[in-house]
């Protein structure tokens, strides 16, 4: 699987990327500080250009970013996010209903809330740790 990973200052990217690679997936990273998690035309264009240049099976992020969800929806690429913060204000956006989304949250109450709101692709998934590194 070819994965495009948006990296920001989250603490758990190293372990997640390492696990993807150990499972045989290829991972490309994109990093950019975002001033707005909902709309950033320049960053959206950059992601689209990467997707047009190379096939990606999914885009992965730690925490949820509406602008990435909307870009994936437009490009027909799966968007997988795994939350590590709660409350995660960025999830309270209409884009959580996009069909491209596969949202995993470590907070069961958060999962139940969004499931009840009608978000189709949301699951409860506790946070993980690299037990070999500890």
Predicted segments, located by residue:
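A short alpha->loop->secondary-structure connector
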Residues: 119-124
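Carbohydrate-associated surface elements
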Residues: 128
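Extreme N-terminal starter segment of soluble prokaryotic enzymes
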Residues: 1-3
């Amino acid at each position: 699987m070819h994965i495009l990973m948006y990296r920001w200052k989250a603490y758990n990217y190293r372990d997640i990327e390492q696990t993807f690679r150990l499972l045989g997936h290829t991972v490309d990273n994109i990093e950019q500080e975002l001033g707005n998690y909902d709309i950033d035309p320049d960053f959206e264009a950059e992601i689209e250009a990467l997707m047009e240049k190379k096939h990606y099976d999914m885009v992965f992020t730690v925490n949820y970013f509406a602008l990435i969800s909307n870009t994936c929806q437009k490009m027909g690429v799966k968007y997988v996010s795994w939350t590590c913060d709660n409350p995660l204000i960025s999830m309270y956006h209409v884009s959580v209903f996009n069909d491209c989304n596969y949202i995993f949250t470590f907070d069961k109450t958060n999962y139940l809330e969004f499931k009840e709101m009608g978000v189709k692709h949301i699951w409860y998934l506790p946070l993980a740790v690299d037990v070999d590194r500890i």
